[in-house]
Amino acid sequence: TCALPILYQPKTMPAIVMVPAMRFVAVDGVGDPNEEGGDYAKAMQLLYGISFTVKMSKKSKNPAEHIGGYFDYTVPPLEGLWSMGEGVSGVDYAHKADFHWTSMIRLPEFVTDKIFAWAKASFAAKHPESDVNRAYLFDFDEGVVAQVMHEGPYDDEPATVAILDDYAR
């Protein structure tokens, strides 16, 4: 995150930035992210579990689990893509049960398909109740975007998004 402060420490005023292509662990779902024990909570367990499996691989006593090209890093913050479903513009905060989401955490460049498969299998062995097949590698190239830091409750996000939309037009 320190390597990309313009992305991970945005200002509270809208700005146009260039986002490079990045690799993520991602999980898709539908529903209210605030539902206790719901689908979103399960997705968070997968995302953070797999992310920290990669990060902590350096501490493994098993040489087969040591990752070539590994460098120590801070697990980046959670990111997400939100919609109300295909063909619907915007997000209706009054109908969170209808949210369609992709939640994701950026992974370091050294995470290959093989390393990702190992991380999923390793996490699944410790958490057999988790459906690791929901997690996938996602290469995302956003390019030029408008961004702003929202401060405050999630339910106040629509006002921040409206400011961002006006700026982007």
Residue ranges and their predicted role:
Residues 2-4:
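Short, small-residue-biased leader/transition segments that mark boundaries at the very start
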Residues 7:
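Basic, Lys/Arg-rich alpha-helical nucleic-acid-recognition elements, primarily the DNA-binding modules
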Residues 10-18, 28-100, 104-105:
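Active-site loop/lid in soluble adenylation, ligation, and acyl-transfer enzymes
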Residues 15-17, 23-28, 138, 145-151:
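Short amphipathic
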Residues 24, 98-102, 132, 145:
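Broad gene-expression machinery/nucleic-acid interaction feature
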Residues 30-36, 107-111, 144, 151-156:
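A generic structural motif
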Residues 38-54, 123-124, 156-169:
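Long, well-ordered alpha-helical scaffolding segments within enzyme catalytic domains
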Residues 114-163:
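A mid-sequence, solvent-exposed acidic-amphipathic segment
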